[in-house]
Design a protein with these regions (language model features):
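Conserved SGNH/GDSL esterase-like catalytic core that processes O-acyl groups on lipids
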Residues: 1-28, 94, 101-212, 238-241, ...
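General small-molecule cofactor/ligand-binding pocket signal
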Residues: 136-138, 228, 266
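Catalytic His-Asp segment of secreted/periplasmic serine-dependent ester chemistry enzymes
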Residues: 152-153, 187, 195, 232-316
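Non-catalytic positions within long, well-ordered alpha-helices that form the structural scaffold/packing
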Residues: 170, 221, 257-258
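A cross-domain feature marking catalytic cores of carbohydrate-active enzymes
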Residues: 181, 231-232
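Surface-exposed amphipathic alpha-helices with a cationic face
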Residues: 213-221
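A short helix->loop->beta-strand "cap" motif at the edges of active sites that frequently abuts
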Residues: 223-226
């Protein structure tokens, strides 16, 4: 609605130049936020702007539009000159001044977390939580824990988790992080005879992956966060599936299920796998690529998160 449009400023200025690789925070804005309502943030680029980074978010609560011209003051877009998109540029956080008892749960991961389960978790929080918890997604498709690509072909996959994680958990009001990350470390390496940018030497051992997850734990603890981890999902049928990858996934999952170094395991794998054939998704839970879950499976993943995580309780 036109009456809800609030311009943002940066040190009092209507526009801002963001240095490459840097973060900027806008001035505070007087804008009422109601629990469970959507917020639209409009950006205008007066000149051609080459997008070198961004993230694709495809959950049901997420999305936006491209449009021609300066539409920032318009409450409605012309459907003939606009296009729906799931790509998010520049915006990483919206901080809200709220009551002290309110808290934030961070969902950290890759393309699986960039898709629907955090959205369904937010919906579940609104339905059965105590109204104090916000769910924040920190996800980048294609990312790995231990390595990142240094070539134009795969630069869009972004930074490795060991670089991303310390920065991305700096979220206002956060007290818990739920990590579901690591499957790309397992499925990406194929050998330089197949893909020059994906050597077999990139395939980690289970011990190396676990040490990467331990880095997450140490970093989160240093920021005062509780740490929950989700198991890695089935991959049988994915184009690079092999016994060596399944063995690695199984070993990492076994550690996640049994370690006493975290506050709890959310067993996403068992929630969506075929109980008769646990290396594959259960019927109706595969999106079709044998790597990403279906929307039904994402909803099931959200159900697997303990209800205690959706409430502000002293002990989870």
């Amino acid at each position: 609605l036109p009456e809800t449009l609030v311009p943002l400023t940066f040190s009092g200025n209507a526009g801002v130049t963001i240095p490459a690789g840097e973060r900027l925070q806008s001035d505070a804005a007087a804008f009422p936020v109601e629990k469970g309502t959507a917020i639209a943030v409009s950006l205008y680029f007066a000149e051609f702007t080459e997008m070198r980074s961004g993230v694709v978010i495809t959950g049901p609560l997420s999305g936006g539009y491209f449009a021609v011209g300066d539409q920032t003051a318009n409450a409605v877009l012309d459907t003939d000159t606009s296009k729906k998109t799931h790509t998010v540029y520049f915006l990483s956080d919206i901080d809200v001044l709220t009551a002290a008892e309110n808290r934030t749960l961070i969902c950290f991961g890759d393309s699986i977390t960039a898709q629907a389960w955090p959205d369904y978790l937010m919906e579940r929080t609104l339905q059965c939580g105590d109204g104090t918890t916000a769910v924040i997604r920190k996800a980048a498709s294609g990312t790995r824990i231990l390595r990142q690509y240094d070539n134009i072909t795969y630069d869009s996959y972004g930074l490795k988790g060991e670089t991303r994680f310390p920065r991305e958990i700096q979220v206002a009001g956060a007290d818990t992080v739920l990590i579901q990350h690591g499957i790309n470390d397992i499925i990406h390496p194929v050998g330089t005879d197949v893909n020059r940018f994906r050597p077999w030497s990139d395939l980690p051992t289970a011990a190396e992956m676990i040490e990467g997850l331990r880095f997450y734990i140490r970093t989160a603890r240093a920021s005062g966060l509780r740490v929950y981890m989700g198991t890695l999902l089935p991959i049988e049928g994915w184009r690079t599936y092999a016994d060596i990858r399944e063995k690695l996934r199984s070993e990492v999952n076994q550690w996640i299920r049994t370690t006493d170094e975290i506050d709890g395991c959310v067993d996403f794998d068992r929630a969506v796998c075929d109980p008769e054939h646990p290396t594959a998704f259960a019927a109706g839970y595969d999106s079709g690529d044998h790597l990403h879950p279906s929307l039904t499976a994402y909803a099931r993943m959200a159900e697997e998160v303990p209800e205690a995580l959706l409430r502000n309780e002293e002990s989870h």
